[in-house]
Amino acid sequence: MSIDMDYMAGEEFITAEELGQELAAFFGLSAGDTVPERVSEQVVVFGGVFEPVGFLVFHIVRKGGMYPGVYESAILKRDFPYEQSVSFRLDKERNIPETLNVVLRFVCHLFRKYPVNALLEVLDRDECLFEKESGKICLRPGSDCFSPETLRACGIEALRAGAGEH
């Protein structure tokens, strides 16, 4: 069994090769450890390497693909159109709270290096909003899936109820 997390970006921001390099650098791996297995033009899978952490990474370009490219966002209270997503499949047999925090730290690293308007959807209920112009990362009110230490380390602020509507 698994849980999926999706980092959905309003524009294409990273190639599969760049994502492999970022995974290697962030997790201290050699470049050979992050060679993707291409599934199609729109899905690139990086897997197996992250077994100790407990997740697989999917680099998915959904533009023109089988997905609509629109996410119904609770934090924005409207649809969020996206061009690209990086998806994480977490193994439920592992330490899910720890894995969620590791993935959030990696996504924040990606955002700092490749700023883009984006949403991170977690467990079908929690969302983080990434704002390109301001550089802010905001967490949906009432979210409880990340540790306070990770939120502080990533510079994430919790939105007040009703905030985030654009």
Where in the sequence are the language-model features?
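Acidic, proline/glycine-rich low-complexity IDRs
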Residues: 4, 105-166
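Charged, amphipathic alpha-helical segments and their flanking helix caps
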Residues: 8-11, 15-17, 21, 96-116
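Non-membrane alpha-helical secondary structure
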Residues: 11, 15, 52, 102, ...
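Short, extreme N-terminal segment that most often corresponds to the first beta-strand
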Residues: 1-41, 45-47, 163-166
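Short, intrinsically disordered low-complexity segments
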Residues: 29-97
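Hydrophobic beta-strand residues in large extracellular and virion-surface proteins
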Residues: 23, 58, 86-88, 103, ...
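Residues in well-ordered beta-strands of folded domains
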Residues: 8, 87-89, 121
